[in-house]
Amino acid sequence: VSAIAIIAGATLGRRSGFMVGALAALASNFFFGQGLWSPWQMYAWGLIGYLGGVLADRGVFPDASASREHRINGKDGDSAPLASRVGRSERAKAVLLVAFGLLSGLLYGMVINAYGVLGFVRPLTVPGAIAYVAASLPFDVVHGVATAVFLLVLYRPWTLRIARVVRKFDVRCR
């Protein structure tokens, strides 16, 4: 969900990224169960999508349309992963995108851990909070790595397709 929220924020704007992240959490919890954690999940994934939009607006992430000429000339087909792009600045932007994917797993974990510490650590002490956060760290790292891998594979093809739909139907999201 984090990668999808980041891609939505980068292609459709920060507000759309927030909505995709928040509504993805709400919709998934209809299947997996709503609970007191649901608003925290909605906020965390919404925040990740929003930050994805902010960073894309600042030019930190690769612009999928920048490789259009490269794609038209027959190199690296339309669905080639982001890592196969040419250009030093685009590679640097791809590295920043992957780094944000890694950090987004930790950011999501921080928000959810705040809920967990406030809701479950009794008595609320600093050692108890540290133990709670330390226990969740492996899951947060796996979440970040998975988000980075999904961004590496899906960012370019999805942004190209979303940009095509936005152009075709004259969608105004920003």
Label for each model-derived stretch:
Residues 22-58:
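Interfacial aromatic-anchored transmembrane helix boundaries in multi-pass membrane proteins
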Residues 1-11, 15, 19:
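Hydrophobic transmembrane alpha-helices
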